[in-house]
């Protein structure tokens, strides 16, 4: 004969009856399948938080183990999409048998993409931090996508000062009005011709998008769009011609943090299925011991909670 195990969540009375906004678990590891552009899915491990609302005031607590099982059954087996996330949220609510009217899931993972060099046939891999927070409350869905883009920024002011220093050095080095082209190019490419260089630094764009309903964009395509918008994404494996091409890209895209922010703003304003956005660009200055930042968000976005 099987032993009946006690279940105090259903047998004991609640000392102080009250509903609770969210109850659940955090830091669960779940393997997920991320769709890739024309490729097989990427299999990554996501740190997952899962919650349901406790709307029944006199209930001792939620059925927590059922949340764990639903995560495994759906996220662990199906392709990550708006469809699978919506199905998961609905199943989480149903699993509570009337205790809950809302469910929420947070996913944090790193998506690794293959990146080709600018000119050569070299390639490497780059990891992008991704966060997805999706919730369904009384039939209303809300999804927030977070991602980080790393890029290079070269200071326009520093570039102008470096050019001026080079111009002054040329004037001092060559007295005659007519300068030999070969002599000038030979001097510029020599050690003495390296008069000054503009400062540049690794920079980051931290972006949060509130999506329309439960729509989930193709992540590799979104990352490519944002990197193209900024113009100077960091590279992986490079040869000398790639490094030179990257130097030219930086010269063509001199930018203060305000310039990078305005580029992102224009792109996000035109992006379909984006209801709200919040972003911060951060230039980790090599000239200073502090960072230069710019923050922007839509009028109806909440700066503190996005």
Curated annotation (Swiss-Prot):
Protein name (Swiss-Prot/TrEMBL): GTP cyclohydrolase FolE2
Keyword Hydrolase in annotation: yes
Entry keyword Flavoprotein: no
Family statement drawn from the similarity comment of this UniProt entry: Belongs to the GTP cyclohydrolase IV family.
Pathway, per record: Cofactor biosynthesis; 7,8-dihydroneopterin triphosphate biosynthesis; 7,8-dihydroneopterin triphosphate from GTP: step 1/1
EC number(s) per entry: 3.5.4.16
Superkingdom, taxonomy of origin: Bacteria
Record organism: Pseudoalteromonas atlantica (strain T6c / ATCC BAA-1087)
Enzyme class, UniProt record, top EC level: hydrolase
InterPro entries, sorted: GTP_cyclohydrolase_FolE2, GTP_cyclohydrolase_FolE2/MptA
Keywords, ordered alphabetically: Hydrolase
GO molecular function, one term: GTP cyclohydrolase I activity
Site entry: May be catalytically important: 155
GO biological process assignments: tetrahydrofolate biosynthetic process
NCBIfam families reported in the protein's UniProt record: PRK13674.1-1 (NF010200)
Catalytic activity: GTP + H2O = 7,8-dihydroneopterin 3'-triphosphate + formate + H(+)
Function comment: Converts GTP to 7,8-dihydroneopterin triphosphate.
